[in-house]
Amino acid sequence: MLIIPAIDLKDGACVRLRQGRMDDSTVFSDDPVAMAARWVEAGCRRLHLVDLNGAFEGQPINGEVVTAIARRYPDLPIQIGGGIRSLETIEHYVKAGVGYVIIGTKAVKQPEFVGEACRAFPGKVIVGLDARDGFVATDGWAEVSSVQVVDLARRFEADGVSAIVYTDIAKDGMMQGCNVEATAALAAATRIPVIASGGIHDLGDIRKLLDARAPGIVGAITGRAIYEGTLDVAEAQALCDGFKG
């Protein structure tokens, strides 16, 4: 399982939100490229970037920062989400050297777009499913749909999606523990690899994910915990590498 540091971008800075609220953010750095360097030096093998402005605007807003990070670390897989709602945007990021694009809102509102994206950019597409009480949320978590997470995930199995990033909104940014049960259930219900996100606080939470022994859980995204020092990236990755499940 990969430990994937998150860099959330708002107005060009590296921030973290609580439960997806743009008015409840903490600025951790005004230099996201330097922050990326910090996690690379800690030994991370993938980075998770989110264009928060883009998620709310429906188009890339912090694209220059994303491109700068991708060009500085061409051998590091980077996944980017937030405002990706057209093939043109995906093409822009792929050409910039980004490894994966995360389709969120558009995957819920127009599921057939995921298939189009996978055909145009095979191996490059991740679907981001954000949920509240098992139902998918969209538009930067501002709207909660009537669509069940598991039902939507299964729909994408035939498209060739590389992974699903599953976020429990109630947990995100709160550091009260990952929703292991829901994440493991999703991994068991679909053939698509699942990346856990939201609520990870410390090594105990990483152990709980590992102890779930769900082979479909291939990664864990962490943000506030690594910025506030309750989780060490290198230590967490070493735990995952040494786990015998």
From Swiss-Prot:
Main location group: cytoplasm
Associated pathway: Amino-acid biosynthesis; L-histidine biosynthesis; L-histidine from 5-phospho-alpha-D-ribose 1-diphosphate: step 4/9
GO terms under biological process: L-histidine biosynthetic process; L-tryptophan biosynthetic process
Pfam families associated with the record: His_biosynth
EC number: 5.3.1.16
Active site: D8 (proton acceptor), D130 (proton donor)
UniProt entry keywords in alphabetical sequence: Amino-acid biosynthesis, Cytoplasm, Histidine biosynthesis, Isomerase
Localisation: Cytoplasm
Catalytically driven reaction(s): 1-(5-phospho-beta-D-ribosyl)-5-[(5-phospho-beta-D-ribosylamino)methylideneamino]imidazole-4-carboxamide = 5-[(5-phospho-1-deoxy-D-ribulos-1-ylimino)methylamino]-1-(5-phospho-beta-D-ribosyl)imidazole-4-carboxamide
GO molecular function, one term: 1-(5-phosphoribosyl)-5-[(5-phosphoribosylamino)methylideneamino]imidazole-4-carboxamide isomerase activity
One GO CC annotation: cytoplasm
Family named by the database record: Belongs to the HisA/HisF family.
Protein name: 1-(5-phosphoribosyl)-5-[(5-phosphoribosylamino)methylideneamino] imidazole-4-carboxamide isomerase
Organism expressing this protein natively: Azotobacter vinelandii (strain DJ / ATCC BAA-1303)
